[in-house]
Amino acid sequence: MIKRRGNVEIRVYYESVRTLRSRSHLKPSDRQQSPGHRVFPGSPGFRDHPENLGNPEYRELPETPGYRVTPGIHDNPGLPGSPGLPGSPGLPGSPGPHAPPANHVRLAGLYSPGKYAPLASPDPFSPQHGAYARARVGIHTAVRVPPTGSPTHTHLRQDPGDEPTSDDSGLYPLDARALAHLVMLPADHRAFFRTVVEVSRMCAANVRDPPPPATGAMLGRHARLVHTQWLRANQETSPLWPWRTAAINFITTMAPRVQTHRHMHDLLMACAFWCCLTHASTCSYAGLYSTHCLHLFGAFGCGDPALTPPLC
């Protein structure tokens, strides 16, 4: 039926009601060649369809009902079962003989080799699953003690190297509470002090790993920049010059040589001390610097008083 609307010609086709009746009395060839009949991939007559007999790709389709080719899987050559991958016979994109089990995940046409977690956790005390208990013991990880009567496993013992030593117990005292100290500093000192506190928190959270050397070099560059700006802004003699000179000399020397957390701790404390010298009379961290920055005071003979030998 043809309808016209202006210059547009519309062709309308009506399907006869007789095509909706059962076609079981027809031959398979008649059902495939009849108009209006569609053969879907995976159906018994799909491979024998006249249009698909010469297509080698469809000749390999299985006859399992409900078989579905995931779209998009043919485009990724690095996936299992993709074209060009050794050991992948059959349809490109179909799982090969060494493909993972059926519990893989298919999302949006992508193949993910991830598997579901096992229902039961392995026994760490069995010989087969002993590797599950070989994880490195962290700061907050409790050491699992084997039950009474079980053989002692060396891999369950805590590594004595992970024990914090007495020398490392007082490292990195600058934490998140130190950020409240920013309002007491001049505006041109706050960015540097904030960087010092953030690096201190990062190193305290990763005390089991060596400190990154690039961080020490970055602190040295930042310290030299703010110290140069402070010198230009204070052309006249300032009583802070000796102390800030001692601090910046130590920072410049230590920054490129950071190897241990003790080095990083001393560098950070010297940087924070440099910042807080601007309000030395009211600084609430004066006691902290008196504990961790004695080496700076000793540089100018202001360390512990020398003991006078008795006269008799």
Curated annotation (Swiss-Prot):
A zinc finger (unnamed) spans 271-283. Induction: Expressed late in the infection cycle. Its main location: virion. Residues 46-62 have a biased composition (Basic and acidic residues). It holds the Pfam family Gene66. Transmembrane segments: none annotated. Residues 20-106, 143-170 are annotated as: Disordered. Keywords: Host nucleus, Metal-binding, Phosphoprotein, Virion, Virion tegument, Zinc, Zinc-finger. It is found in: Virion tegument; Host nucleus matrix. Phosphorylated. One of its GO terms (cellular component) is viral tegument. One of its GO terms (molecular function) is zinc ion binding. The keyword Protein transport does not apply. Belongs to the herpesviridae US10 family. This is Virion protein US10. It comes from Human herpesvirus 1 (strain 17) (HHV-1). The lineage of its organism: Viruses, Duplodnaviria, Heunggongvirae, Peploviricota, Herviviricetes.
